[in-house]
From Swiss-Prot:
Organism field: Lachnoclostridium phytofermentans (strain ATCC 700394 / DSM 18823 / ISDg) (Clostridium phytofermentans)
Protein name per its UniProtKB record: Peptide deformylase
InterPro entries per UniProt: Peptide_deformylase, Peptide_deformylase_sf
Record gene name: def
Family: Belongs to the polypeptide deformylase family.
EC number, UniProt record: 3.5.1.88
């Protein structure tokens, strides 16, 4: 397993539509592991394959506090939503930035696991937001296109402690 470079906004791959995964090859299996390593190392809660330069419909998410409950979504599709939440949203492809985005508060997704077994998963709150955000990446959509108002700078906890 290895960390991969995260593509930053302005890289054209982030604006392209990803291709469906037909089978999990050893290359895709390695990509899944690398994406998890990359996401955890960067302190993110989600990562889509285009963010590491691969135009495949693959997303990894982990919103657990311990960072030990990864959700792997191959060819994910949102099949139902409910409610609404509005809050700050950031992205590993836009480091140091955030913006207010309105998303569904509940989302149900159908996808395939790393063994190409179909499943459905539901999420509320942060998990619902992560589902929407990461699946948008697969269609070349960045959260900045959905921001209410302006994107703003964010500081990390480390920077605040040093002041």
């Amino acid at each position: 397993m290895a960390k991969r470079n995260i593509r930053i906004m302005g890289d054209s791959i982030l604006n392209k539509t990803s291709k469906v995964i037909e089978e999990v090859t050893p290359k895709i299996d390695t990509l899944i592991d690398d994406m998890l390593d990359t996401m955890y190392d960067a302190g993110g809660v989600g990562l889509a394959a285009p963010q590491v330069g691969v135009l495949k419909r693959l997303v990894v998410i982990d919103v657990s506090l311990e960072g030990n409950e990864p959700i792997i979504l191959i060819n994910p599709e949102i099949i139902s939503t409910d409610g609404e939440q509005t809050g700050d949203e950031g992205c590993l492809s836009l480091p140091g930035k955030a913006g207010i985005v309105t998303r569904p508060n509940y989302v149900k997704v159908k996808a395939y696991d790393r063994h190409m077994k179909p499943f459905e998963v539901e999420g509320e709150g942060l998990l619902a937001r992560a589902f929407c955000h990461e699946i948008d990446h697969l269609d070349g959509i960045l959260y900045v296109e959905k921001v209410n108002g302006e994107v703003h700078e964010v500081t990390s906890y480390d920077e605040e402690e040093e002041e």
